[in-house]
Curated annotation (Swiss-Prot):
Phylloquinone binds at W692. This is Photosystem I P700 chlorophyll a apoprotein A1. One of its GO terms (molecular function) is electron transfer activity. The gene is psaA. Keywords: 4Fe-4S, Chlorophyll, Chloroplast, Chromophore, Electron transport, Iron, Iron-sulfur, Magnesium, Membrane, Metal-binding, Oxidoreductase, Photosynthesis, Photosystem I, Plastid, Thylakoid, Transmembrane, Transmembrane helix, Transport. The lineage of its organism: Eukaryota, Viridiplantae, Streptophyta, Embryophyta, Tracheophyta. It is a multi-pass membrane protein. It is found in: Plastid, Chloroplast thylakoid membrane. The keyword Isomerase does not apply.
C-alpha cells in the first residue's frame, strides 16, 4: 500500500439544469438523430428508429452525455422492476389463495390468477386444492413470502403499494439526475468511491438489514407456522421488533440482548444463527437460522470490503495501482492501461459485468434445487423446474450479451495506438492459436460425444445391448464427478467439522428428505448416462464460446477483411465486388452465437427435467418405498438418441398434446402457437433480401394501379434486420414451446 499526500477535498460533481425538460422534443420521433428526425421516406425508418433509440453512442460522442443517459435509463429500469414487483404482490393480495396455501402447503398448490369467463376460458381455472379454482403458478413467490414472514394478504397489499411508491421515486430520480442535477463525468469515473459505496452500502448494509429482518421477523413467524399455529394468531412483525420478551420465549438468549456480542460469548446466539447444513425436515428448505447466519456473515465481509479503497484519505487501495502491478511472466505489460479502458468504455465495463452476472445466474439455477432456500419449494416440482429453466436461459442470454458488448468495445472504443504489449494486445496477437485450438476442441468433443450416442443407437438397433455404453454393459462412470460428490459428502467430518451435515443432500451420504409424502431431495446418483450427456454439454458450450470469442478477437480485423473496424459493429458484407465476405461482422457472430447458446441451454434443461423426474422427484409410501415420476428410466433410456426422442420428448409431450378440454389447455395452445412462431422465423432466416424486394415492388405496382400507394415507400428488411427478426422469433418460439411442454407435463404429473 502506497502512502500518498491527502487527496484534494470533495469537488462539486453535478451540473445544475443541464438539459431543459421539453415534451415537444420527446413528442418528435427520432429527436436524438438528425437523419431519423426528418421523418420517414421509406419503411426502413421505423426499424432505424428502434435500432438507434437506445444506442446512445450514435446520438453523441461526448462520454459525459452518454454516461448521463445510461445512468438515467437505469432509474427507468428500476422503476419498471418495482412496477413489476408491485404487480406480483398485488396479484398475491387480490387474486391468490396465499392464506389457504400457508395453512396447508403440502396439499394446496399456489395460484394467483383467476381467469374471467368471457368465451368459456374459465376452464383454465383448475382445482388447486382447498376449494380454490385458478391457474397454478410456478414462480416461487408464495415460498419466498412465507420465508420472509408474510402471513396475510393485507401485508401483500401494503408491500404492493410500497413498491409503487418506490417505482415513482425511481422515475423521478431518472428525470432529476438528467434534467436537474446531472453528475459530471468525473463522478462516473470515481471507481474507488463507487466500490466503497456499492460494497458497504448495497451489499453490506443490504445483507445486514435482511439478516436483521430474518432474525427479528422471519424466524419467529416461521417457528409458529412450522408448529401449526394459525397465521391469524401469530403476532404481527412489529410486535416481535418492539417486544423483546416475545422473541425471548422462542429464543431464550434474546433476553440477554447485546451482552454476549460485546463479551465475545457469541455461542449464545447459536439458537438463531446456526451452522447446521442440510434441509429442515419440516419444510424441505434450508434452515432459516442458517440463512440468517449466512446473511450476517456476508454483511460483515462486505462492510469490511467497502472500506478498502482510497478516496479522500491517504489510505487504502487504488484500482489503477492494483491493475498496473498485475504482471505475469507471459503477459508483458499485464493490466497496464486497463484502468483507462474500464473508465472510458462502458461497453468494456458492461461486458465484464454481464459475463460475471451470467455465470452467477447459472450458479443460482443449480443452487435452487440442490440447496432449496425457501420452505416447501423442494416439493413444488413445477416451481423447481421453472426456476431452473428460467435462470439457465437468463444466464445464457447474459453471457452472449457479454460477448456482444466486448465486440462493440473492440470496434468503437479500442485504440490500438495506445495499447501495446498489454494483456489484451498479447491475446489479440495470438488469436489464431486460440481460435484454431478451440476449433479443434469443438471437433473433438462433437465427434466423440455424438459418436458415443451413435454407437449406442447402432448397437441397440442391432439388438446387441451387451455392447452398449451403459451402467449394465460397458461402463463409462463419471469417476471425477463421483469423487467431487464424495468429497463434499464427507466434508462435515473432515474439512468442515463445525457443520452437522453437508451443504447439499445431492452429494450423497444422507437419508432422503420427504415432506408431505413427496421427495424433497435425495442423493443424486451419476452414471454412464450423465457422462454421455455431460460431453454434449461440453461440446455445445465450447462451440458457443468459439463463435462468440472469434467475434470479439476478429472484430477489428482479419486476414479476409483487414479494415473490418472501419465497417462498424454490424454490416451485411464487405460491399459489392467482394464476394464471400458476408456474415463476418461482430454482430453476425453474436447472431450465430445465440443459436448455439439456445442449443446448449436446451440440452441442459432437458437433462435436468428428465434426470429429476427419473431419479429424484416422486412419492414415498408409509413403508418408505420411493416411486419416481418416470421410474428411474433415465440411466437406460437417455444413452441413445432414440431414447431421448422416444422416452423424453415424445413420451413426456403427451400431457401437453392431450391437454385440450382440461385446465391445462392453454399450454396446448401455446405449444402449438409457439411452434408456429418458431417456424415463422425460418422464413426470415432462409430467404434473401432480393426475393422480398422483388415481391414488394410487384405489390407496390398493384397499389399504384388502384391509386392506393402510400407516401412512405415500402422496403424489404435489410439483411441484418431480417436476421435480427429471425433469431428473435427462433428463440422466443423455441423457449415458449419448451415452457408449455415442461409446465403441462410437470403440473399434470408432479
Amino acid at each position: 500500500m502506497i502512502i500518498r499526500s491527502p487527496e484534494p477535498e470533495v469537488k462539486i460533481v453535478v451540473d445544475r439544469n443541464p438539459i431543459k425538460t421539453s415534451f415537444e422534443e420527446w413528442a418528435r420521433p427520432g429527436h436524438f438523430s438528425r437523419t431519423i428526425a426528418k421523418g420517414p421516406d421509406t419503411t426502413t425508418w421505423i426499424w432505424n428508429l428502434h435500432a438507434d433509440a437506445h444506442d446512445f453512442d450514435s446520438h453523441t460522442s461526448d462520454l459525459e452525455e452518454i454516461s448521463r443517459k445510461v445512468f438515467s435509463a437505469h432509474f427507468g429500469q428500476l422503476s419498471i422492476i418495482f412496477l413489476w414487483l408491485s404487480g406480483m404482490y398485488f396479484h398475491g393480495a387480490r387474486f391468490s389463495n396465499y392464506e389457504a396455501w400457508l395453512s396447508d402447503p403440502t396439499h394446496i398448490a399456489p395460484s394467483a390468477q383467476v381467469v374471467w369467463p368471457i368465451v368459456g376460458q374459465e376452464i383454465l381455472n383448475g382445482d388447486v386444492g382447498g376449494g380454490f379454482r385458478g391457474i397454478q403458478i410456478t414462480s416461487g413467490f408464495f415460498q419466498i413470502w412465507r420465508a420472509s414472514g408474510i402471513t396475510s394478504e393485507l401485508q401483500l397489499y401494503c408491500t404492493a403499494i410500497g413498491a409503487l411508491v418506490f417505482a415513482s421515486l425511481m422515475l423521478f430520480a431518472g428525470w432529476f439526475h438528467y434534467h436537474k442535477a446531472a453528475p459530471k463525468l468525473a463522478w462516473f469515473q470515481d471507481v474507488e468511491s463507487m466500490l466503497n459505496h456499492h460494497l458497504a452500502g448495497l451489499l453490506g448494509l443490504g445483507s445486514l438489514s435482511w439478516a436483521g429482518h430474518q432474525i427479528h421477523v422471519s424466524l419467529p413467524i416461521n417457528q409458529f407456522l412450522d408448529a401449526g399455529v394459525d397465521p391469524k394468531e401469530i403476532p404481527l412483525p412489529h410486535e416481535f421488533i418492539l417486544n423483546r420478551d416475545l422473541l425471548a420465549q422462542l429464543y431464550p438468549s434474546f433476553a440477554e440482548g447485546a451482552t454476549p456480542f460485546f463479551t465475545l460469548n457469541w455461542a449464545k446466539y447459536a439458537e438463531f444463527l446456526s451452522f447446521r447444513g442440510g434441509l429442515d425436515p419440516i419444510t424441505g428448505g434450508l434452515w432459516l437460522s442458517d440463512i440468517a447466519h449466512h446473511h450476517l456473515a456476508i454483511a460483515i465481509l462486505f462492510l469490511i470490503a467497502g472500506h478498502m479503497y482510497r478516496t479522500n484519505w491517504a489510505i487504502g487501495h487504488g484500482l489503477k495501482d492494483i491493475l498496473e502491478a498485475h504482471k505475469g511472466p507471459f503477459t508483458g505489460q499485464g493490466h497496464k492501461g486497463l484502468y483507462e479502458i474500464l473508465t472510458t468504455s462502458w461497453h468494456a465495463q458492461l461486458s465484464l459485468n454481464l459475463a460475471m452476472l451470467g455465470s452467477l445466474t447459472i450458479v443460482v439455477a443449480h443452487h435452487m434445487y440442490s440447496m432449496p432456500p425457501y420452505p416447501y419449494l423442494a416439493i413444488d416440482y413445477g416451481t423447481q423446474l421453472s426456476l431452473f429453466t428460467h435462470h439457465m436461459w437468463i444466464g445464457g442470454f447474459l453471457i452472449v450479451g457479454a460477448a456482444a458488448h466486448a465486440a462493440i468495445f473492440m470496434v468503437r472504443d479500442y485504440d490500438p495506438t495506445t495499447r501495446y504489449n498489454d494483456l489484451l494486445d498479447r491475446v489479440l496477437r495470438h488469436r489464431d492459436a486460440i481460435i484454431s485450438h478451440l476449433n479443434w476442441a469443438c471437433i473433438f468433443l462433437g465427434f466423440h460425444s455424438f459418436g458415443l450416442y451413435i454407437h449406442n443407437d447402432t448397437m441397440s438397433a442391432l439388438g446387441r445391448p451387451q455392447d452398449m455404453f451403459s451402467d449394465t454393459a460397458i461402463q463409462l462412470q463419471p469417476i471425477f464427478a463421483q469423487w467431487v460428490q464424495n468429497t463434499h459428502a464427507l466434508a462435515p467430518n473432515v474439512t468442515a467439522p463445525g457443520a452437522t451435515t453437508s451443504t447439499s443432500l445431492i452429494w450423497g451420504g444422507g437419508e432422503l428428505v420427504a415432506v408431505g409424502g413427496k421427495v424433497a431431495l435425495l442423493p443424486i446418483p451419476l452414471g454412464t448416462a450423465d457422462f454421455l450427456v455431460h460431453h454434449i454439454h461440453a461440446f455445445t458450450i465450447h462451440v458457443t464460446v468459439l463463435i462468440l470469442l472469434k467475434g470479439v478477437l476478429f472484430a477489428r480485423s482479419s486476414r479476409l477483411i483487414p479494415d473490418k473496424a472501419n465497417l462498424g459493429f454490424r454490416f451485411p458484407c464487405d460491399g459489392p465486388g467482394r464476394g464471400g465476405t458476408c456474415q463476418v461482422s461482430a454482430w453476425d457472430h453474436v447472431f450465430l452465437g445465440l443459436f448455439w447458446m439456445y442449443n446448449a441451454i436446451s440440452v441442459v434443461i432437458f437433462h435436468f427435467s428428465w434426470k429429476m423426474q427419473s431419479d429424484v422427484w416422486g412419492t414415498i409410501s408409509d413403508q418408505g418405498v420411493v416411486t419416481h415420476i418416470t421410474g428411474g428410466n433415465f440411466a437406460q433410456s437417455s444413452i441413445t438418441i432414440n431414447g431421448w426422442l422416444r422416452d423424453f420428448l415424445w413420451a413426456q409431450a403427451s400431457q401437453v398434446i392431450q391437454s385440450y378440454g382440461s385446465s391445462l389447455s392453454a399450454y396446448g395452445l401455446f405449444f402449438l402457437g409457439a411452434h408456429f412462431v418458431w417456424a415463422f422465423s425460418l422464413m426470415f432466416l432462409f430467404s434473401g433480401r432480393g426475393y422480398w424486394q422483388e415481391l414488394i415492388e410487384s405489390i407496390v405496382w398493384a397499389h399504384n394501379k388502384l391509386k392506393v400507394a402510400p407516401a412512405t415507400q415500402p422496403r424489404a428488411l435489410s439483411i441484418v434486420q431480417g436476421r435480427a427478426v429471425g433469431v428473435t422469433h427462433y428463440l422466443l418460439g423455441g423457449i415458449a414451446t419448451t415452457w408449455a411442454f415442461f409446465l403441462a407435463r410437470i403440473i399434470a404429473v408432479g
